[in-house]
A protein has these predicted regions:
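Long, highly charged, low-complexity intrinsically disordered interaction regions
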Residues: 4-6, 10-111
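Conserved small/polar residues in nucleotide/adenosyl-binding loops
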Residues: 113-118
Length: 118
């Protein structure tokens, strides 16, 4: 099990960061929130969640444990997959997600899920 990857960010694209860890580049799917916290060619630590399926092995990287916990909570909900969870967290990070849940803002959550399925 991987807990985090730490090293220089060598690729930073929408939805993707590659972190060089001792000469191995780990490609991590990231939210817009995490991307906003990273800088190309600078050191970073991403907490990772692995997704292993028959046809793919993906790493999802998060700038904080809080964001990672929100992702894991979201993906534990029936019908919410990784893509929808990443879309929800991209709209404002873990703070906005927590606020939406606490205030019962279903509109924000369902709008982001709808965008993820387009």
């Amino acid at each position: 099990m991987l807990y985090y990857v730490s090293g220089q960010v060598t690729v930073l694209e929408p939805g993707l960061a590659v972190v060089d860890c001792g000469g191995v580049g780990y490609g991590c799917r990231i939210t817009a929130y995490t991307a906003g916290q990273l800088k190309l060619n600078q050191a970073a630590r991403l907490y990772v969640t692995e997704s292993i399926r028959e046809d793919a092995f993906d790493l999802y990287g998060f700038i904080s444990k809080e964001e990672q916990r929100c992702y894991e909570l979201l993906t534990s909900v029936n019908g919410v997959g990784p893509k929808a969870a990443m879309a929800i967290l991209s709209s404002g990070g873990p703070q906005n997600f927590t606020l939406a849940v606490m205030t019962g803002n279903e509109k924000m959550l369902t709008a982001e899920i709808g965008r993820a399925h387009v």
